[in-house]
Structure formats: C-alpha cells, structure tokens
Amino acid sequence: MKPAFTAGELNTYTSPGDVTAVSRALRHTGRRVMLVPTMGALHDGHLALVRAAKRVPGSVVVVSIFVNPLQFGAGEDLDAYPRTLDDDLALLRSEGVEIAFTPTAAAMYPNGLRTTVQPGPLAAELEGGPRPTHFAGVLTVVCKLLQIVRPDRIFFGEKDYQQLVMIRQMVADLNIDVQVVGVPTVREADGLAMSSRNRYLDATQRELAVTLSAALTAGAHAAHLGGAAALRAARAVLDAVPELTVDYLELRDAGLGPAPAHGSARLLVAARLGNTRLLDNIEMQIETPAGTAGPDGDRQYAQSPWRN
C-alpha cells in the first residue's frame, strides 16, 4: 500500500521505505525535496535551517528527527540527550513543514553496523580528538538519509563547522548528487550559539557560556594583526574564566587545513562548563602583522564579526 501524503499538512513517517516512496512521488510532480537532518530538541537554530529550505522555490521540506547512536562514543550523553518529539512536531507544524521522518535505530540499522563510512584523517582532529568514532557515525547516518530521501539540497548549520566540512567532503568524494547548504549560526541575544545542549546549563553556567562567542569576537577584531594575534586575543578572554575547561582553540583555513597567513580563516573553540560541552566558531579575515591586506584585498575584519 502506498504511504499517504497530504499536501499542506505535516506528514510523519517512521519507515525509511515510506519516505523514499513519498519523496520519489513528489519529485515526479516537480516538487524539489529539501532535507534538514536533526537529532530533535529543536530550537531557533534548527528553524533557521527549515526556513532556508522553505525559501527554495517549489520546495517540500523533509525534517528528520533521529538521535543517532552511531555518533555517540562510550560515556557520552546518548541516554541523556533531550528527546522532545511532541514539541518538535508541533514546531514543525507551525513552520509549515510537510514531512517529518522519525525512524527508530532498528529501522535505520536493521542489520547492525555492517557497512559504515570511513571519514578520513580530518575525523581524528578537533572534535574527533576525544571522539574518534564520532564522524564515522555522522557521515554514515547522513549518507543513509541522503539515499532514503534523495533530496536536491541538504541543510546544516555552521555552528558544527567541522561536521559541515566533512559532509561536503563525503558528498564530493563519493559523487553524491546533492547540494550541501551551510546556514549561518543562530545566536541568543548575548551571542551564545544556539544548541540543544544549552538546556543542560544552570543559570550561572549560562551566564559564563557567552565567553566562547566573546573570545571569538576578540579574535576576529585582532585578526588585522595576524593569526597569532587573533589566537592570543581569544585565549585571553577564555583564560579569564577559570570555570571554563577549554578542549581546543584553533585557527584553520576554510577547509580546516592549516591556517593561512592572510585571507579567510576559521577560529574554532570547544570548551566545557561542568558536564556540558559547547562549540562555536567564527569566520575572519587574517591580515599580515604589518597591517597590509593580502592579495584577497579589503580589510573585511572591520565589519561585523558575525558574518560567518
């Protein structure tokens, strides 16, 4: 029996086969399928992805909600990860999303972990340092979602910047026919990057959490003095908050290779407040220490640092 689909309403499916069939039928009618993969616990950052997907002419938006066990390592917060499915579906309904895909782990991995994606050397750096299996889990589930949904475009936030880079790498290396769209990080009024994990913070930790974005802003404003100056400025802000345990603060190029001497770069930070681990990053324009612009031209560092 064909799965039912009602246009203009939220249709929820748990079976991968049902989503594949509905997506195929919609594509045959000329609709353009957009995929927003999430692990639920939706917030305004996720909704920014949904809205970006909805802006595509002729689009039908599929939001997947799946807490992927493959990307959680030993001792990580899989069981504690917030699950708010009813609230999430209500949000999607209010945004005019037409398809929610909410599979179980058994539906996604019916044969266990028989075949997985090998993510390559970048998976051992930055986030992959303390979490060596994380990106194999991320890329495997995203690859599966792409095969199940067959979207024109897939949307990710820039907050998880390494994830975005690695998904682009997988799509290019495995010749997957999809456009990967990165959406700028959505922030609270004080600059904190929105994250499902922010709800773990107590009131004191929540006040201190803004240190990450403050450090990145300081780094961006110092970037006209060179990469080393940007790192020093950011580190000084982080060091002023002893409650913060910094896992890394690194400057890289846009593809997460070595930082350039000048031009576009990414400053990335990961830190813990209590048991909560927070990530953030910012794009910046590095200039030579002499203050002269490199061949990339204008002094863009003087603009708003949140042009990421």
Swiss-Prot record:
Q: What is its EC number?
A: 6.3.2.1
Q: Which GO terms describe its molecular function?
A: ATP binding; pantoate-beta-alanine ligase activity
Against Gene3D superfamilies, the record matches this protein to: HUPs, Pantoate-beta-alanine ligase, C-terminal domain
Q: Which UniProt keywords apply?
A: ATP-binding, Cytoplasm, Ligase, Nucleotide-binding, Pantothenate biosynthesis
User: Reaction catalysed by this chain?
Assistant: (R)-pantoate + beta-alanine + ATP = (R)-pantothenate + AMP + diphosphate + H(+)
Biological-process GO terms, alphabetical: pantothenate biosynthetic process
Q: Does the keyword Ligase apply?
A: yes
Pfam families, per database record: Pantoate_ligase
Cellular compartments per GO CC: cytosol
What residues form the catalytic site here?
46 (proton donor)
**Binding of beta-alanine, residues:** 71
Pathway, per Swiss-Prot/TrEMBL? Cofactor biosynthesis; (R)-pantothenate biosynthesis; (R)-pantothenate from (R)-pantoate and beta-alanine: step 1/1
Q: What is its main location?
A: cytoplasm
InterPro entries under this entry? Pantoate_ligase, Pantoate_ligase_C, Rossmann-like_a/b/a_fold
- The ranges of region (Disordered) come to 286-308
- Quote the record's binding site residues for (R)-pantoate: 71, 163
Q: Which SUPFAM superfamilies match?
A: Nucleotidylyl transferase (SSF52374)
Superkingdom of the organism of origin: Bacteria
Record's CDD domains? PanC
Q: How does it assemble?
A: Homodimer.
* Extra information: The reaction proceeds by a bi uni uni bi ping pong mechanism.
Entry similarity comment = Belongs to the pantothenate synthetase family.
| Known function | Catalyzes the condensation of pantoate with beta-alanine in an ATP-dependent reaction via a pantoyl-adenylate intermediate.
From the Swiss-Prot or TrEMBL record, give the protein name.
Answer: Pantothenate synthetase
Q: Which organism is it from?
A: Mycolicibacterium paratuberculosis (strain ATCC BAA-968 / K-10)
Gene (name only): panC
